[in-house]
Amino acid sequence: ALDWVDVVSALSADPKATSELAQSISSYPKSSPGYFADTQKKVKDFVEAGQLGIFAKAYWGHPAYKLPPEANLMAVAHYLEALAWQRDVSRLHAIFGGKNPHPHFLVGGVPCPIDLDSDSAINSARLSTVQGIITQMREFVDQVYVPDTLAIASFYKDWGAQGEGVGNFLCYGDLPEKGIADPSSYLFPRGAILNRDLSTIHEVDLHAIDEIKEYVAHSWYDYSSGKESGLHPYEGETEFNYDGPTPPYEQLDVEKSYSWLKSPRWKGNVMEVGPLARVLMMYANGHEQTQELVNYTLQTLNVPVEALFSTLGRTAARTLETKIVADNLQTWQDNLVGNIKSGDTRTFNEVLWEPSSWPKKAQGAGFMEAPRGGLAHWIVIEDEKIANYQAVVPSTWNAGPRDAEGQAGPYEAALKGHQMVDPQQPVEILRTIHSFDPCIA
C-alpha cells in the first residue's frame, strides 16, 4: 500500500476535508474529522521524534506519488487500522490451528477437536468468536479495503498499462465445497490460462511428469542430467553449485547462473501465480460474483479489460479476492455449525495414519492456493521413509530466473519497459515487484 501512499504528505492534509472525502466513498462510521486528526498527530509525533518505525526507509516526497494530502491521510489512517484488523483476523488461525503463525497441523485434517462442552476444544464460545471476526472482517473489507483501493487506483490508472509480465496464469485450485477429490467444487478453480486468453482454460495435472518441471540453467544448482534439462518435482534434485561472485556484489552476470531459485515451467510455459491468476481463473470460469466485481472495478476506473494484466490489475485483484473470500467465510461458518448440529464433528481422516498400512512405495502432492499463489509439495516415500521431497512455492514461480530457452520469469518480464524518475529511489520497480507479494522463506 505504501508504494502508492505518501505518508509524510498526510501531515499537510485537512482532517475535515479528509473526513468529507472518506464519507463520499464509504459509510465507514469512524470517518470523522477527529479520527483523522488523531492519525495525523500520531504520524507527526513519529516524524518529529525521528522514529518512523514501519514508515522508515521509504521515498516520501517522490514525484511518482500522485495522491492529494487528504487521500494520503485517509489511506494512512486505514493502513494503521488494517494492521490491528489483521491481528484480529489471525485469531482464526489460532482457534482452529492452536497458534499463529505456524499453526499446528495433523496429517489428514486439523488438530482441533470439536466438543461444545469442553473448555479446551472448539466450543460454542469459540464459534461465537469466529462469527464475530467474520462479521468484522466483512465490514472492514466492504467499508474500507474495497473503496480505498478504487479511490487510490483512480489516481494511478496509467499503471493499468505497466507491469504485465508473461500473460500466462496458473492455479492449483483450492477451497473445495465437496472435498479435495472434486476439483470442480473448488472456489478457486484449477487450471492454466495462456496468452491472456480467458476463453480457454487448460487442465493441469500436478502428477503428470511432462507438465510441471523445474529448470536450473540460470540457477546455482546442478542436475545429474545436465543444467539444460528439466525435472518434475517427483524426480527433482537439489544439488548446490554456487559459482557466482564473492559477496557482497552489486552486479550479476545474467548470462550465467544468478539465482538461488529454480525456474518452474508448466508445459514449457512461464506462469504467474497469485491473486491475479485466481481472479482471472474465477472470472473465466463464470463465477458470478467475480465477474460482477471485476466488471464493476473496470467500469468505475474507466479502464479497458487489458488493465487486468498489469501492476494495477494485480494489486486490485488482491482486494477483490479478499472480498470474495470474506463473503464465503460466512457460508463456511454456517456449514460448520450445521455439521456440528447434525452430529458431524470429524476433524481428520485417520485411514492412512498408520505407516504400516502404506504401500512399499508411494508418492503424492499436497497443494493449496497460498495468499501469494499456488503452493505444492511433492513427496516420494519408499519403505516408510522419505526418498525425495520437493517444494515449489509461489515466489519460485514468480521470481525464478530465465530458463534454458531464455524465457524471463514473471518478475523480470513485468519490469520490462519501466522508467524511473530517480534510479536511487526506484519506487516504480517496488510497485511492480510488491504487486506479486514476494516472499522467499
Protein language model regions, located:
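A translation/RNA-centric and nucleic-acid-associated enzymatic feature enriched
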Residues: H377, E382
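Active-site bordering "gate/hinge" segments
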Residues: A1-R372, D383, V393-A441
